[in-house]
């Protein structure tokens, strides 16, 4: 508690245990086959771009170099979270690996299936579809009604949504 004599030291020790985004991403890409010099930012960016190319993902994330040089993180905003899932598709992660990547590397929640785009990404990753196939599905989904949904007092948890998505079959 803040009243303890060594509270500041303990808090600093906890803070020191967190890795910068670039460090966490370094460990991730090494685990996924990067063999180059870990201090070579250009080579790391080229490795990530090669994964995007192999996956057929046309758009590269902005600020990739800054992930390693300026410790810029992927922000927790809907448009920026797409970058997280592009990385999941590029590195061919499964659902569990994608969840771990979100939480342990990006320090964000996993799939937010309350968002249509992320629900589709969950479905696509679960069924081993490509990023481009996921985007095709997203473009076909009707725009949601902006009216509040009456759940009759129930709470719609992400786990409930994913259980329903898990029932869908890929054709």
Enumerate the predicted regions with their spans.
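A generic alpha-helix surface/boundary motif
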Residues: 23, 46, 81-85, 118
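Long, charge-rich C-terminal accessory regions
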Residues: 159-171
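Short acidic alpha-helix initiation/capping motifs at coil-to-helix transition points
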Residues: 29, 34-35, 75-83, 111-116
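Amphipathic alpha-helical segments within well-ordered protein domains
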Residues: 26, 85-89, 121
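A short, Lys/Arg-rich alpha-helix, primarily the initiator
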Residues: 1-51, 134-154
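Short amphipathic recognition helices of helix-turn-helix/homeodomain-type DNA-binding modules
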Residues: 95-153, 157
């Amino acid at each position: 508690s803040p009243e303890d004599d060594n509270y500041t030291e303990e808090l600093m020790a906890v803070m020191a245990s967190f890795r910068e985004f670039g460090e966490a991403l370094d460990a991730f890409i090494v685990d996924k086959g990067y063999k180059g010099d870990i201090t070579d930012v250009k080579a790391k960016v080229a490795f990530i771009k090669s994964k995007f190319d192999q996956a057929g993902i046309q758009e590269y994330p902005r600020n990739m170099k800054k992930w390693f040089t300026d410790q810029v993180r992927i922000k927790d905003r809907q448009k920026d979270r797409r970058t997280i899932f592009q990385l999941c598709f590029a590195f061919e992660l499964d659902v569990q690996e994608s969840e771990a990547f979100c939480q342990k590397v990006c320090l964000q929640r996993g799939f937010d299936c309350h968002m249509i785009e992320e629900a589709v990404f969950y479905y696509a990753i679960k069924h081993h579809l490509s990023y481009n196939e996921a985007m095709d599905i997203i473009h076909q989904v009707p725009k949601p009604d902006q009216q509040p949904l009456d759940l009759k007092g129930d709470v719609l948890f992400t786990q409930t949504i994913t259980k329903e998505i898990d029932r869908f079959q890929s054709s």
